[in-house]
UniProtKB/Swiss-Prot annotation:
Gene3D superfamilies listed in its UniProt record: 3.30.160.20, Ribonuclease III domain (1.10.1520.10)
Name used for this protein in its record: Ribonuclease 3
GO molecular function, one term: metal ion binding
UniProt keywords, alphabetically: Cytoplasm, Endonuclease, Hydrolase, Magnesium, Metal-binding, mRNA processing, Nuclease, RNA-binding, rRNA processing, rRNA-binding, tRNA processing
GO CC aspect terms: cytoplasm
Family, as annotated: Belongs to the ribonuclease III family.
Residues that hold Mg(2+) according to the record: E42, D115, E118
Reactions listed under catalytic activity: Endonucleolytic cleavage to 5'-phosphomonoester
UniProt-listed InterPro entries: dsRBD_dom, RNase_III, RNase_III_dom, RNase_III_sf
All residue ranges annotated as the DRBM domain in the record: 155-225
């Protein structure tokens, strides 16, 4: 486990000065490094992020349907987007990781970076209040909220299903072919089977849902050629 570096610089990047540095310390601590890790803060931050982004989208798009709002929110709060924010903050430089995670490059892993962003949101909430969280999250997401649109936010599984239904084809079948790793860091291999392709298409990701989306995206590319 490495010591946390240059916390004042991180606070300036986040736009928030902690009253209780212990909250930030815990938010940056992965379960591989200590029993006092960031998973409970991540749980809290995930809920706060969801309500802040939901509220912002609700007011920004008064004519959008519930489905459009849900898809835009899913795009904005997904692990990939959170990891992008973490990279902008150079969050990997500050994470506390156990020896195994350090050796395997955990400070670059999308899931660890995304979880840390949510944990920091939870830490800020406990250190201040929901309004501070709201303003900070909106600041972090300002450029992303400016460009998000109700169109083209459907996930690959939805797009694939709609495409197949349009041409009266059977719906895809998803099957978990393989899982590996510990419970908290599993890798899922999922097969997507469609009538028009002779072989199943494989998606690999850190969750079953993400692996299914990856496989669906590949199938779409293949059948539209």
């Amino acid at each position: 486990m490495e010591p946390i570096k240059n916390i004042p610089r991180l606070c300036r990047t986040l736009g928030y000065e902690f009253n209780e540095k212990a909250f930030l310390d815990q938010a940056l601590t992965h379960r591989s490094a200590s029993n006092k890790h960031n998973e409970r803060l991540e749980f809290l931050g995930d809920s706060i992020l969801s309500i802040v982004i939901s509220d912002a989208l609700y007011h920004q798009f008064p004519a959008a349907t519930e489905g459009d709002l849900s898809r835009m929110r899913a795009t904005l709060v997904c692990g990939k987007m959170l990891a992008e924010i973490a990279i902008e903050f150079k969050l990997g430089d500050y994470l506390k990781l156990g020896p195994g995670e350090l050796k395997s490059g955990g400070f670059r892993r999308e899931s660890i970076l995304a979880d840390a962003v949510e944990a920091i949101i939870g830490a800020i909430y406990l250190d201040s209040d929901i309004e501070n969280c709201r303003q900070l999250v909106l600041n972090w997401y300002e450029s992303r909220l400016k460009v998000i649109e109700p169109i083209n936010q459907k996930d690959p599984k939805t797009l694939l299903q709609e495409y197949l239904q349009k041409y009266r084809k059977p719906l895809p079948v998803y099957r978990v072919a393989h899982t590996e790793g510990d419970a908290h860091e599993q890798t899922f291999t999922v097969e997507c089977i469609v009538e028009d392709l002779s072989q199943a298409v494989v998606g690999v990701a850190s969750s079953r849902r993400k692996a299914e989306q990856s496989a669906a995206a590949q199938v779409l590319e293949l059948i539209k050629k």
